[in-house]
Amino acid sequence: MTNLRKTHPLMKIINSSFIDLPAPSNISSWWNFGSLLGVCLVVQILTGLFLAMHYTSDTMTAFSSVTHICRDVNYGWLIRYLHANGASMFFICLFLHIGRGLYYGSYMFLETWNIGVLLLFAVMATAFMGYVLPWGQMSFWGATVITNLLSAIPYIGSDLVEWIWGGFSVDKATLTRFFAFHFILPFIIAALAGVHLLFLHETGSNNPSGLCSDADKIPFHPYYTIKDILGVLLLILVLTSLVLFSPDLLGDPDNYTPANPLNTPPHIKPEWYFLFAYAILRSIPNKLGGVLALVLSILVLAVVPFLHTSKQRSMMFRPFSQCLFWILVADLLTLTWIGGQPVEHPFIIIGQLASILYFLLILVLMPLASLFENNLLKW
């Protein structure tokens, strides 16, 4: 009798995706982040579901409902901090996953890469709306500042902002719709992740060498299932350590003050994972220019496959491209630091230089380095 997992309509999909999937024999731990992102998404959906059972999306009671969750609900504090810090872990895994894709040339799988960029936008939108829900000072002012950016769009801008707000300012209608969107988007993300995986399995995984690995494939189970479980255990270890020892390490103290439209915090800044984009936004003195730069800072990823000029796929054997890649990483860390600083003399110019360098590296320097390396090989 044939195995049920190979014949059952549902089981055979799971089988061909996670059990009998032919995988390259040399993929490193950098390939673990896809499964870690899946785990993060499941954790976020589950903790979010339990939080939604006790949360009220009303301006009068939102802040106190979060307090109620932390004080009165059984393990409510744990669920709340798992959700908040789970978002940080999600973004750490996302950035490492994207970095891996850039380094090893995984962006050459066009459909998979473009759905990935779409996923990044969806996750960023979800995280932004989630940050508004506790209705603290930074929630309110973050929502006001970021939604206000849409007013920079010519002709329809101001109408668009009022349409999103559901009034003339960030208020009850805004909070209610943000909660609705924050609840539905993770399920859309899960569906997109399924499509992401579908396209990946059309081609098979890339590997560190960037060469075709069809001649040397191994089954996903048990080799990579056990490897993924190790990654998941490490992720859980880091997340629980963060939640149980310093749950507010990555948060903003201002968000423990209830939202007050009459009192602006001295420094309005988003969560740490948006700081790099926020720094790029602030580095351009023009409002529309800043908004365009903000969108392009993420959208530039979609252009990367078309700027691949190298004869080799991976950066494994390309020292000049490697050097530029690590400069890009350092530049992003610099932008993250600048995004959290006040708009004062040394920080303004550093932010502007780092923003210019960011676009210059991706759009100009890395493609040129690839051409140079091609010539070194005398091809």
Curated annotation (Swiss-Prot):
It is found in: Mitochondrion inner membrane. It comes from the Eukaryota. Its main location: mitochondrion. The gene is MT-CYB. Keywords: Electron transport, Heme, Iron, Membrane, Metal-binding, Mitochondrion, Mitochondrion inner membrane, Respiratory chain, Transmembrane, Transmembrane helix, Transport, Ubiquinone. Component of the ubiquinol-cytochrome c reductase complex (complex III or cytochrome b-c1 complex) that is part of the mitochondrial respiratory chain. The b-c1 complex mediates electron transfer from ubiquinol to cytochrome c. Contributes to the generation of a proton gradient across the mitochondrial membrane that is then used for ATP synthesis. Binds 2 heme b groups non-covalently. The chain crosses the membrane at residues 33-53, 77-98, 113-133, 178-198, 226-246, 288-308, 320-340, 347-367. The cytochrome bc1 complex contains 11 subunits: 3 respiratory subunits (MT-CYB, CYC1 and UQCRFS1), 2 core proteins (UQCRC1 and UQCRC2) and 6 low-molecular weight proteins (UQCRH/QCR6, UQCRB/QCR7, UQCRQ/QCR8, UQCR10/QCR9, UQCR11/QCR10 and a cleavage product of UQCRFS1). This cytochrome bc1 complex then forms a dimer. Heme b b566 binds at H97, H196. This is Cytochrome b. Heme b b562 binds at H83, H182. Heme 1 (or BL or b562) is low-potential and absorbs at about 562 nm, and heme 2 (or BH or b566) is high-potential and absorbs at about 566 nm. InterPro entries: Cyt_b/b6_C, Cyt_b/b6_C_sf, Cyt_b/b6_N, Cytb/b6-like_sf, Cytochrome_b, Cytochrome_b_C_euk/bac, Cytochrome_b_N_euk/bac, Di-haem_cyt_TM. The lineage of its organism: Eukaryota, Metazoa, Chordata, Craniata, Vertebrata.
